[in-house]
């Protein structure tokens, strides 16, 4: 009996010691870096072959920066120009990386780039920071309903690169082992065209989709959700709440620093966790943070409804920890700017593009400023056009509802309120004071 108790005690002690050894020493990890950077590369080269770039990174023991840029999109074009030009802020840092530039989502190799949980696909510029073995250090990118410059800046990218370099060249990094597993490179590259939803998505795409040579990033988001849509399990209210903002947990971060807390809303998840203005976020969800996109990624992969997210932060050099307690509805953001949502494969569009009436037109047709005032751009052959909608019709209500929404806001409002197979009735004015109704069925395909 005594020997059994001794054995049990030793076993428990060993288990405790193993658990303690297995837990990352976050105080050391986020503390002062012990890194010595090598001489920068003589020239910044934006490579297009990811596998060759990885081999080059291994040979030189340099981290990789992989940028994905959807060239047709104007969104983030100014930021992309800043990155490509480099300048005195970015060039000295870019020259420390093996840089890769991909301009077609077909070129994404899913073995390296885990787009499903680590890339906001409605954004036309995104960055991945990888180790020479392909382990994921950090991500960079971001946008909101305000603009494409409220979440990212060249200064924010520079700070993130400095943090990644300090982490990569820290002699203790391999011992920490916090960067996740290296990718399995066996087999052929896995393009976005190998995703389960690709064939169904492509077959239902219009002539423009079938004609295009590349795949846009927002279309990858549509492809990813296609199987759930086909299975009838996709919830257009729950499953569209993607990439929450720091403000969703009550935290406002400095854009150019990425992790510095500017303010915390009273009684929010952030405030209740103990976070204050002036703190610097350091760790969340068991991942080290290098910038705002990393934190948003943790939120994105976090609870759908009620739950907790572990978080750590630095205050005057001292590491502190707490939990973000989130409740139902915490993920909600403004969605209509998202191309994959307002004009993607969720439901069906109205069959016209909803342009805004001018102030003079509203006055002429006696339409209140807070009511619907949509001037339709006519799509030839659409169900709305076939039902009699014309370009001179001013739309003032849909099924009796008259919110003041236009453009993509109208598109998402329509898709979120009405389902394929349902009847919709447009109330229109053909001339001032002359009202009629146009009814049609929303197509199922």
Report each predicted region and the residues it spans.
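PDZ/PDZ-like domain segments forming the peptide/carboxylate-binding groove
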Residues: 242-283, 287-290, 352-397, 401-404
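Bacterial N-terminal signal peptides
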Residues: 7-17
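PDZ-domain C-terminal substructure recognizer with occasional recognition of PDZ-binding tails
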Residues: 282, 297-337, 390, 396, ...
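Sequence context surrounding c-type heme c attachment/ligation sites in exported
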Residues: 91, 99, 119, 150-249
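Thioredoxin-like thiol-disulfide oxidoreductase module
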Residues: 52-54, 87-136
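The canonical Cys-X-X-Cys-His
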Residues: 65-77, 210-221
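Typically the conserved alpha-helix immediately C-terminal to a functionally engaged Cys/Sec
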Residues: 75-92
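A short beta-strand-turn-helix
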Residues: 46-62
């Amino acid at each position: 009996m005594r020997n059994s108790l001794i054995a049990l005690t030793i076993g428990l002690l060993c288990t405790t010691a193993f658990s303690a050894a297995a837990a990352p020493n976050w105080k050391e990890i986020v503390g002062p870096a012990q890194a010595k950077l090598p001489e920068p590369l003589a020239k910044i080269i934006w490579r297009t072959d990811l596998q060759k770039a990885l081999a080059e990174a291994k040979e030189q023991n340099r981290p990789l920066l992989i940028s994905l840029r959807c060239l047709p999109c104007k969104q983030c074009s100014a930021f992309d120009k800043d990155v490509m030009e480099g300048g005195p802020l970015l060039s000295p840092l870019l020259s420390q990386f093996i840089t890769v530039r991909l301009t077609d989502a077909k070129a994404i190799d899913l073995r390296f780039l885990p787009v499903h949980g680590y890339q906001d696909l409605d954004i036309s510029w995104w960055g991945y920071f990888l180790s020479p073995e392909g382990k994921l250090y950090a991500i960079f990118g971001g946008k909101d309903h305000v603009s494409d410059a409220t979440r990212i800046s060249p200064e924010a990218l520079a700070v993130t690169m400095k943090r990644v370099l300090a982490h990569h060249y820290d002699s203790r990094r391999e011992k920490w082992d916090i960067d996740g597993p290296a990718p399995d490179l066996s087999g052929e590259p896995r393009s976005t065209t190998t995703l389960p939803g690709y064939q169904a998505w492509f077959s239902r795409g219009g002539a423009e989709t079938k004609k295009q040579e590349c795949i846009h990033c927002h279309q990858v988001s549509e492809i990813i959700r296609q199987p759930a849509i086909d299975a009838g399990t996709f919830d257009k209210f729950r499953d569209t709440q993607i990439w929450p903002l720091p403000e969703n947990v009550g935290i406002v971060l400095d854009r150019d620093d990425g992790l510095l807390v500017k303010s915390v809303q009273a009684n929010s998840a952030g405030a209740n966790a103990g976070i204050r203005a002036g703190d610097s976020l350091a760790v969340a969800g068991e991942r080290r943070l290098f910038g705002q996109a990393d934190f948003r990624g943790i939120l994105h992969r976090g609870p759908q409804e009620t739950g907790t997210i572990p978080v750590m932060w630095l205050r005057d050099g001292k590491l502190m920890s707490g939990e973000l307690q989130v409740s139902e509805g915490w993920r909600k953001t403004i969605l209509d700017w998202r191309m994959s949502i307002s004009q993607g494969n969720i439901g069906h569009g109205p069959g016209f593009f909803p342009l805004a009436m001018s102030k003079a037109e509203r006055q002429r047709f006696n339409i209140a400023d807070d009511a619907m005032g949509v001037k339709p751009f006519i799509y030839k052959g659409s169900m709305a056009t076939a039902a009699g909608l014309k370009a001179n019709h001013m739309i003032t209500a849909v099924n009796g509802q008259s919110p003041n929404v236009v453009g993509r806001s109208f598109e998402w409002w329509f898709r979120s309120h009405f389902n394929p197979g349902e009847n919709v009735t447009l109330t229109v004015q053909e001339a001032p004071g002359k009202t009629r109704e146009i009814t049609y069925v929303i197509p199922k395909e």
